[in-house]
Amino acid sequence: MKHVIIGMAGHVDHGKTELVKALTGVDTDRLAEEKKRGITIDLGFARLDFPDGSCASIVDVPGHERFIKNMLAGAGGVDLAMLVVAADEGFMPQTVEHLDILQLLGVKGGLIVLTKADLVDEDWLNMLEEDVKSRVKGTFLEDKPILRTSVRTGEGVEALREALHDLTLHAEEKSARTPFRLPIDRVFSVDGFGTIVTGTLIDGHIAVGDEAQLMPLGNQCRVRNLQVHGRDVSAVYAGQRAAVNLAGIKKESISRGDVLCRTDSMQPSLMLDVKLQNLPDSKRIIESGSRLHLYHGAAVRLAKAVLLDRDALRPGESCYAQLRLSEALAARQGDCFVVRFYSPLETVGGGVILDEHPYRHKRNDARVIASLAVRESGSDEAKLVQAVGERGADGMTLADLAACFDEPEEKPVEMLAVLCARGKLVEIAPSRYLISSTLDRLWTDCETMLTKYHREHPLHAGMRLAEARQRLLRGKARENADAILACFAREGKLTLTAEHCALADFSVHLTKRQSAIREELLRTCRAAGILGKKQDALCALFDKKDRMECARVLESLLSTGELVLLAPELCVEKSVLDAVDARVKAWFETHDTLMLGEFRDALGTSRDHALLVLEYYDRRGILRREGDVRRLGAQFGEIEK
């Protein structure tokens, strides 16, 4: 079922609340002060039922200038707008400001209602309609229906209901795939239930029992119960007004403007890259460095507007800007916002968020401007390439891209294939992509690193993988580093083993004397069996003049894996250790555990030396010690290779 929010807008005392009551039977003025003063101060909500069983939610917002802050809190989740104009007064200052706000917030559909039609004659109504048409020209309400109503006589109320029903049927359906997000416009507690927050779910869906997080502080909580218009429900979907009963958090820890979201789905930010617009009828020039009030969802923040390509933004102009906030804010790319002048407090503009987690930019940086232009209006392919490129060596998975563009995973697959074929992207591992220029830069770094290593260690088989990962991709996940190195190997640029990496054209070249030393070292270690030989003892086999060469050859044999360090300084020849591996494997084919005494007898060696070998297997993860016995370790499969 499609869920739609209809927002009321218009000047104070133009009949918005009375119109909602006529449509729904609900008096949205819930505060005693509202009843006393006869004006709406805070947000009111009502359910509008249609004859076919469908419904919509109506948000009644205050029209008085002093309560624009509250109006903005309710306008954030609006799908359709009802701009209310009293027939006896016409367009007024808050009518204009509300229309500007709805336009800035990206509302696409709606209609105009002339209330109190019974107070004026037909000629006046016709003249007012023409005036309204001229005032909404160029806005989302241009050419939209204008309906005449009177709640006192009932004129036009049913026609309005039918028009609203038709609009809801054609309203754009919201995605339920993105993680849920609910900007909080009200928080209170109820005896026996605890903390309750209300708001419009603008993304995804939320269910009873879901774990949730409150941003920007990041406090954890759980959804205990859900209501939509006073009725208990098991789940709420994007486009519905909801009351959410939260467990695990107190009312005092939550403020209006906080965002309830799926755990770990959002991160707060102190900076936003935006496309900023100064309204055509604004009386103010927004200079770079100006302080503004930023309204996003139900939140308000002070912001410093840093204009990225000019010194001042004049009425009717727009530009890229970075908003630097006084307090952290949880937002998403594509969100709309409104800005009001710092003092005097008046609406001057707004825009759309292009990057919710930017770096701090310098002004007049052409690369930044070009990047933001792609974010704003680039092709899907350009946006995809840029999104991958911004992740650097981390790259992006297919799932990341689908979430980023709010599409099922099947959608980007064809585009990714085309971009890979064009050489824009590289699939470094199944469903993980890197931008080609990033991979080229990494290869240049890798080639430089290994060339230097081979020059300094000509007898080594290559750099140890752990060292290569750390030096080339500092701080990156091992899985991603291995995928990049494997990609270089597939391209024929690298030689990879389980322990080392080397340039593809590198090989160890021994002198005649080094070759003789190598053979003697291997023969001696092979003869020593599992007891092995200490490195000092091996070097002592040679004259003093050859001991330096012996140390180099030993290092080479250890790097190639022909010799293995069983313990510090203790070398064992690989074929000897392979034979012990085979015994261990055979043992565990018929046993669940291995005791030290059993292993000692199998090797025919001392208890101390058998323990030394077992500890070597423990370190490799091949075996795992539990008390006095060993069991199979997580890496046992290595000895089967």
Regions found by a protein language model. Give the residues of each.
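Alpha-helical scaffold elements adjacent to nucleotide-binding pockets in ATP/GTP-utilizing enzyme cores
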Residues: 19-22, 94-101, 127-135, 159-167
